[in-house]
Amino acid sequence: MIPRRSSDITIKTRSDVLPFSGASSRWLQRYAPALLAVALIIAMSISLAWQAAGWLRLQRSPVAVAASPVSHESIRSDPTRLARLFGTSAQDPNAPPPATNLDLVLKGSFVQSDPKLSSAIIQRQGDKPHRYAVGGEISDGVKLHAVYRDRVELQRGGRLESLPFPHRSGGLLASADDITSENDSIEQLQSLQDENAAALRERLDALRQQMEATPIAEPAEEDSSEPTTTPTESD
C-alpha cells in the first residue's frame, strides 16, 4: 500500500510542472523579439549618453584652447623662428636696389613718359656735373640704367645700385654750406643750359651757312618770242 501512494504523488507533481514549462516557453517565444529590441534601445541610449558626456567635457574645458593663442603670438613676435620654419622670404621686386658706394652726387633727374628718353645730372668727385641719358656711361663699367623722381639706378658689374638725392642733416633751416651748395648747383645747371643753348646756336649757324653756300638753281628762262610769219600778198 505504501509504494502505490508514493508513485501517485510523483505523478501528480510532474503533471503540475509540465503545464508551467509550456506556458513559459510560449511566453518567451511571444515576447523575445520585443525584449531584444528593448535591450538594443537601452544599449544605444547608453552609448549616445556617453558620447554626449564626452562632447560636453570638451566644450567645458577652455583652458587648453586659451593656451594656444599665446604660443601663436610668441611665434609671431619672433621673426627668427619664422625664418627657420618657412625660410627666408623673397625680396620685394618693387624695392629699390642697394645704395651705391661710388663717389657720385645726384643733382637732378628728368623723368619722361618714355623711360628711354629720361636723363639725370650726376656729378663725380672733383668734376663738373654732367647730364647723362639712360644707357650712358658715367665711368668705366658704370652706366645709367633708369631714372626716377627720387633716385637713379646704376648698372655696375652686371648688378643694379641706386643713387638717391643727398639728404639734408639738421632741422628745417638750412646751413650756410647747404645754401652755398644749392647756389653752386643752380649755377652749374645754368651753365649746362647755357652750354646747350650755345651748342644749339652753333648748329643753327652751321646749318644756315650750309644753306647759304649751296647755290640755288635758277629756273631756265622761257623764250617768250613768238615766231613771226611774213605775210604774202596773193596775186
Swiss-Prot record:
In what ranges is there compositional bias, type Low complexity? 226-235
Keyword Phosphoprotein assigned to the entry: answer is: no
Q: Which GO terms describe its cellular component?
A: plasma membrane; type II protein secretion system complex
Annotated InterPro entries:
T2SS_GspC_N
Periplasmic topology ranges: 56-235
Swiss-Prot/TrEMBL keywords: Cell inner membrane, Cell membrane, Membrane, Protein transport, Signal-anchor, Transmembrane, Transmembrane helix, Transport
Stretches of the chain found on the membrane's Cytoplasmic side: 1-34
Using the UniProt annotation, give all residue ranges assigned to the region (Disordered): 205-235
Locations listed in the record: Cell inner membrane
According to the record, the signal peptide region is none
> In Gene Ontology terms, what is a biological process of this protein?
protein secretion by the type II secretion system
Residues annotated as transmembrane: 35-55
What name appears for this protein in its UniProt entry? Type II secretion system protein N
Organism ancestry: Bacteria, Pseudomonadati, Pseudomonadota, Gammaproteobacteria, Pseudomonadales
